[in-house]
Amino acid sequence: VKSAQKKDKEMVEYDSVVITGGADDMAPSSGDMMENSVLSSEESLDYSTTNVMTDGVDESDVVKTDGKYIYMVEDGQISITDITDGKPDEEQKLRPDFESPSDSVEELYVNDGNMFIVTNHLNDEGNDETICYSYDITDPLKPQLIGRSSQDGYYSTSRKIGSIVYVFSNTSIQMPELMVKKAALNPNNLDKWVPKVDGEIIDYDCIYIEDETTSGTVISSFNVDDPSAVIDTKCIMNGNDDVYVSNNAMYFYSMDWKRNRQITTISKMSFTDGIMETGESTSVSGYLNDKFAINERNGYLYVLATYSDKETEVNSLHVFDGEMKETGVLNEIARGELVYAARFVGNYVYFITYKQTDPFFVADITDPSDPKLLGELEVSGFSEYLHIWDDTHVLGIGYGDSDRKTIKLTMFDVSDPAHPVEENQKIFDHEGYYCEAMNNYKAVLVEPQKNLIGFAVDKYYLFSYDSGKGFELMEDASLKFENERGYRGIYKDDDFYVAGNGEINYFKLTGKKS
């Protein structure tokens, strides 16, 4: 990577192709260091994948590619565009066999000849359901429906490990009044208030109630090739703030106020090949202000929490073992500051705080019983997202000013963890009012091996990086729907695509923008 950074970058030749139309709708047939790339040995295709939290744990998104086609969520359907020859070509529209016209496609997976679609549905009783469809895409322009599944609740997120998908939906249990509890517990009435998966109520021994709450998460697991055959189902009633998924466990966390103190409860659920098993719970003072502020490595869970009140803010780093017992803690970090971005890798955690001095921190987590703060660097501006660039560099994407009117890219040199250095920075103006990359890591493309950094604001900005020259703009592709969510940068070999909201911009990766 270092040698690649020192090479002069080739010129980008912008060959503008915008795809917004397509063929007629087709009725379906019944019947981390994270590198965002896949190299197919069979056909030597090098193409990007979704930016994910955990290496080895795939995540659904609104745009996917298998190196031959681009699959994009578009107005309640999926558009499938042929990119075999580079330039976007033949396109097909797939509209799932919805339960009702108001159903919406949320996200999808594409792997090994299979397309898995997640949708939201409002049933006849006015309750939310998550419905998943699985398609055989051996011929991507003629997808064949092979199975479906449903579960109560509004779709929240999902994860895929191998061929097993875990789907999470937010639900609420309307507990019956005391005077009618006996009637409600009648098996004939249970389906009125107990969540269901594929029309079957969840077994009582698979429902876990953490506290006095009526909201929680339904989790189901199944093979992508046969979603109708549910492997396992669980429901955890914990307030459903968010979930972090490692390679072998889920950690559900939710914040609550108790006696004017912020408490975040974290509950562990282990899994193997789709079978889920509940574990222990713990709690920390404060809340998690960044999705990457929680991480599991080597059997330990690390949590970077922020506590704030009317007077000040303070942060702390907690370490828990497999039984969720605290083994170590680092208190009193950056008083008066809020954690805005974090990233765990190897024996270190890197994080940015923001409010007054906006420092970049490095903490050593080699010893789970004794985490230590190693280095601190005060910088202007602040990062909302951190990404590991290589063994000695961390990329930051954020804002150059408190008004968020400028975007700032930063490359931190962490070769000496005790003395981090801002190696290069780039601050640029933009005409947008929203940058999805700041709130959704899946909207970011970072590929050190191809020297690409991309994200959308008012345009799609694509940069390269050289330690001597800094960040260099490769392209700023215009977007039909400026400031919209859902645009993704995708590459296949030397072809680059900006796909989202029904359009595809295409250009060749042949050099920096002149």
Give, region by region, the residue ranges found by the protein language model.
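Beta-sheet-rich non-transmembrane sensory/scaffold domains
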Residues: 1-514
